[in-house]
């Protein structure tokens, strides 16, 4: 059920309450300690003032006081030792954190120096950020439902960046690209000139370049430094930044307002051999910067897939860690479609940062069906009036899969709008869906309209969804709604469809296939791409014995 809010809503009151409780407890402890010391001192002084007749009692009292003082000193020494031990433990934990972060960085890319000033700036910034970071665990709120130990406890093995054995796969991917579309291709996170459309001089449409200069050289790698929108997921974006190189970064500049502008970004991941238990292959960390100039328009289509050579997909163990930064100038429009179909042994962490200026529009439609663990940190900040943001996501979690979306939208200006629709199907008892969506409407964001809804479908018993939609409203002239539903297939809906002469199996198939149709239908990139996405959903469901008998 959706609920509306028109008043300020923050969590500061509960935090203040916790602070007061903590302060009261500390004062109570001090009073108890002081009272004990007074009693001890009083007893000792009284015994010192006794008459000669009570000398024996005085000696006994002094002895007890001496013993008590000895115990107090011992306790103090023990406390000091405990403090030293805790300090040593903290230092040890920090050392382990640093060791893992360095291991992750070194496994992703070699550490040779670069003559590019923007590369050195990004690496220096990331080094400082990571020195203040700690390795995430399930004890951290942001990682409670994501088994991050799959990454942090694994032995990371750097994968060969060679493009061998991917030719047939890439040809198959490119066959679905509409005529006239530009292509940006990455193989194991490394930019591929062979399969990309490098065109740095296109002054009227869309240019693709590996040369980072001007305003982009200043902006790239800075969006994760905004503390207002950033969360604990930033550590992987910062590892990506620490691995910056000129050959794992691509820049897309959109200059034309032609609505037919299309850019395909293909992320092909492969592992040349099976990995031992506990090993996780990794490669370069891809980063894309999209600069949509004033009044420009573009459709960006991203496709993630595991390739195994000879056109065959296989489930190899690897970790992909990518970042996309998008800047929209005034009146720019970006339609973003994303399909993630990694193999079911892969781990994928991704961050998307969006900055929107006045009257711009950003829309994403993403479908995630692959990977053993998938985490998308999506951060959007509106930087001007009349800005429009649409975030649409369909996740499918099957056997032993976790599909996790963490999003944050910041509205800072008047008459902004945002609409977030999240759908998740969990088709296995060992599958898990996670949604943590945050929308913050700041004080100056008057006359805004913010909507957020998450709908989750559990197809089997013991399937799990952890959903937390969150609206923080500080402005007082707004229209905001949010809601959350978690359910299995409704018997009434099944009965209604069966009453039309269809079998229960077809009725079930209709309801399941229709659950994510709204998101898929909104994708750009042509009908071939949409059909590809539908097939990935159908294939993923079939792995968990959920057959779609209708298209």
Predicted features along the sequence, with ranges:
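Compositionally biased low-complexity segments, especially N-terminal hydrophobic helices
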Residues: 36-42, 48-57, 61-62, 70-84, ...
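Conserved beta-strand/loop scaffold segments within soluble protein domains that form the structured core
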Residues: 222-502, 516, 520-551
């Amino acid at each position: 059920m959706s609920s509306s809010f028109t008043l300020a809503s923050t969590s500061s009151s509960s935090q203040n309450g916790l602070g007061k409780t903590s302060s009261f407890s500390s004062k109570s402890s001090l009073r108890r300690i002081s009272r004990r010391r007074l009693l001890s001192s009083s007893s000792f002084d009284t015994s010192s003032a006794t008459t000669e007749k009570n000398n024996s009692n005085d000696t006994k009292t002094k002895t007890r006081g001496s013993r008590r003082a000895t115990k107090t000193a011992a306790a103090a020494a023990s406390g000091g030792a405990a403090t030293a031990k805790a300090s040593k433990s903290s230092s040890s934990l920090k050392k382990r954190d640093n060791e893992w972060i360095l291991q992750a960085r070194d496994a992703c890319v070699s550490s040779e120096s670069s003559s590019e000033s923007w590369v050195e700036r990004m690496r220096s910034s990331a080094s400082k950020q990571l020195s203040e970071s700690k390795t995430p665990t399930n004890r951290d709120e942001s990682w409670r439902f994501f088994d991050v130990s799959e990454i942090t406890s694994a032995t990371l093995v750097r994968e060969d960046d060679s493009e061998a054995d991917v030719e047939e796969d890439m040809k198959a991917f490119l066959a679905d690209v509409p005529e006239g579309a530009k292509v940006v291709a990455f193989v194991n996170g490394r930019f591929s000139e062979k399969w990309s459309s490098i065109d740095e001089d296109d002054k009227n449409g869309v240019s693709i370049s590996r040369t980072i200069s001007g305003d982009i050289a200043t902006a790239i790698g800075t969006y994760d430094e905004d503390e207002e929108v950033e969360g604990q997921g930033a550590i992987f974006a910062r590892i990506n930044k620490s691995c910056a190189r000129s050959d794992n970064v691509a820049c897309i500049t959109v200059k034309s307002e032609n609505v037919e502008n299309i850019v395909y970004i293909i992320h092909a991941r492969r592992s040349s051999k099976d990995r031992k238990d506990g090993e996780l292959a990794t490669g370069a960390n891809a980063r894309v910067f999209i600069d949509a100039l004033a009044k420009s328009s573009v459709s960006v289509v991203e496709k993630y897939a595991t390739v195994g050579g000879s056109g065959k997909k296989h489930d190899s163990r690897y970790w992909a860690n990518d970042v996309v930064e998008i800047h929209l100038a005034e009146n720019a429009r970006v339609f973003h479609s994303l399909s993630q179909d990694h193999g079911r042994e892969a781990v994928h962490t991704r961050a998307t940062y969006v900055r929107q200026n006045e009257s711009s529009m950003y829309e994403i439609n993403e479908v995630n069906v692959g990977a053993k663990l998938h985490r998308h940190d999506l951060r959007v900040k509106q930087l001007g009036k009349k800005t429009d943001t649409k975030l649409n996501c369909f996740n499918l979690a099957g056997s032993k899969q976790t599909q996790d979306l963490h999003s944050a939208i910041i509205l800072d200006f008047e008459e902004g709008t945002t609409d977030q629709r999240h759908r998740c199907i969990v088709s296995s008892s060992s599958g898990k869906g996670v949604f943590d969506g945050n929308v913050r409407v700041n004080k100056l964001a008057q006359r805004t309209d913010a909507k957020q809804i998450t709908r989750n479908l559990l197809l089997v018993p013991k399937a799990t969804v952890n959903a937390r939609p969150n609206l923080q409203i500080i402005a007082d002239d707004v229209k905001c709604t949010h809601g959350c539903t978690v359910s299995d297939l409704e018997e009434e809906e099944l009965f209604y469809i069966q009453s039309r002469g269809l079998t229960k199996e077809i009725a079930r198939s209709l309801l399941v296939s229709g659950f994510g149709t709204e998101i898929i239908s909104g994708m750009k990139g042509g009908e071939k791409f949409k059909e590809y996405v539908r097939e990935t959903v159908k294939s993923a469901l079939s792995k968990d014995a959920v057959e779609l008998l209708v298209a």
